[in-house]
Regions:
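Surface-exposed coil loops of outer-membrane beta-barrel proteins
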Residues: 3-22, 30-114, 124-131
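Detector for outer-membrane/organellar transmembrane beta-barrel domains
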Residues: 84-86, 104-105, 111-207
Length: 207
């Protein structure tokens, strides 16, 4: 799919193919469709919000979402042993990046575990590890995103999440950051919905 606008200018500033939103292919590796592989510019496996506002509970995106990837470029392997469990592994070009920044930068790695106890409840845990630019040099970044998406009734839905990351610095110091958030949405009728978001973001070293 293609894209343009201020979102593209902000999030794809250093990319030559910035007008590509998603471009990937996938295939199942077995007849039972438990194993699959996808390759290309993929939707981000981190977080519960997308760049398309109407798919989120609130029209404005959370600080947590704005400071984590909206897309990833690389390879995804998924194993889905049942309707409840899903396990994925990723090899990517890095944190929200289509092109690799430098030839000597190794690929980044990630994982995703999803547990869907019912059609109304999903718990998801995603991780990322890779070298990212800290303002001076490329150093290691470790990141974890955990959230619970629960639909309580045909009117109430909540999402609670927690991000925690660590960026190593060139002077052997570390720069941690974290962000808890809770979002609730109430459906008034078929035409109207209301939502409330409470969040906290701490990044004392401006990672």
């Amino acid at each position: 799919s293609l894209q343009s606008g201020t979102y593209v200018d902000d999030n794809y500033a250093n990319e030559k193919m910035k007008n590509l939103n998603e471009a990937y292919v996938g295939l199942f590796l077995d007849q039972q469709k438990k194993h699959s592989v996808e390759v290309g510019i993929l939707p981000s496996y981190i977080g519960f919000e997308t760049a398309v506002s109407h798919t989120n509970l609130t029209l404005t995106r959370s600080l947590l979402a704005e400071n984590s990837p909206y897309f990833m470029t690389g390879i995804k392997y998924n194993y889905k042993p049942s309707d409840k469990w899903s396990f994925s592994g990723f090899v990517t070009n890095g944190w929200q990046r289509i092109q690799k920044p430098e030839k000597d930068i190794p690929p980044a790695f990630g994982t995703q575990i999803s547990y869907k106890s019912s059609s109304n409840s999903v718990v998801n845990w995603s991780t990322f590890i890779g070298k990212e630019f800290n303002g001076m040099d490329y150093t290691m970044r470790y990141f974890s995103n955990l959230y619970w998406d629960k639909t309580w009734s045909n009117k109430w839905r909540t999402i609670s999440g927690l991000d925690y990351g660590i960026q190593t610095l060139s002077n052997d110091d570390t720069a941690p950051w974290f962000s808890p958030v809770i979002i609730t949405q109430y459906t008034i009728n078929s035409k109207w919905q209301s939502a409330f978001r409470a969040e906290y973001y701490q990044d004392t070293k401006n990672t």
